[in-house]
Amino acid sequence: MAKKKRTRGPKKEKRIVPVGVAHINSTFNNTIVTITDPEGNVLTWGSGGTAGFKGTKKGTPFAAQLAAEMAAKKAISEYGMKKVDVLVKGPGPGRETAIRALQAAGLEISLIKDVTPIPHNGCRPPRRRRV
């Protein structure tokens, strides 16, 4: 039997998104940087794990820096991004480092906003550690 020749569909065109939103979710265990378009559709992302770190090293500021750099470089090269609004969530050690890394990678930061959820006396927090 002769093999059927597969026809490819039209290639996906490159979108140019000059302005985006960088969401930085920084916990004590990891930092996740997600870059979206203004509507909230994810374009690219990076985390301490995708930067090559495992275990407790994912929560370090250096891991956050590499994660933000990776996400920013991809956003610049693939989508032509120039400006970002930064929304930071969480209490982790990688917050400031990730913002600095976005700026160092060549993105212009127009806004930094803290969107950390604060309970109005909600769930009981975890107990204090005794080391």
UniProtKB/Swiss-Prot annotation:
- Domain of life the protein comes from: Bacteria
Cystine pairings recorded for this chain: none
- Pfam families (UniProt xref): Ribosomal_S11 (PF00411)
Task: Please give the GO cellular component terms listed in this UniProt entry.
Answer: cytosolic small ribosomal subunit
What are the protein's GO molecular function terms?
rRNA binding; structural constituent of ribosome
The UniProt family comment states: Belongs to the universal ribosomal protein uS11 family.
Q: Relate the protein's function as given in its record.
A: Located on the platform of the 30S subunit, it bridges several disparate RNA helices of the 16S rRNA. Forms part of the Shine-Dalgarno cleft in the 70S ribosome.
Please state what the protein is called: Small ribosomal subunit protein uS11
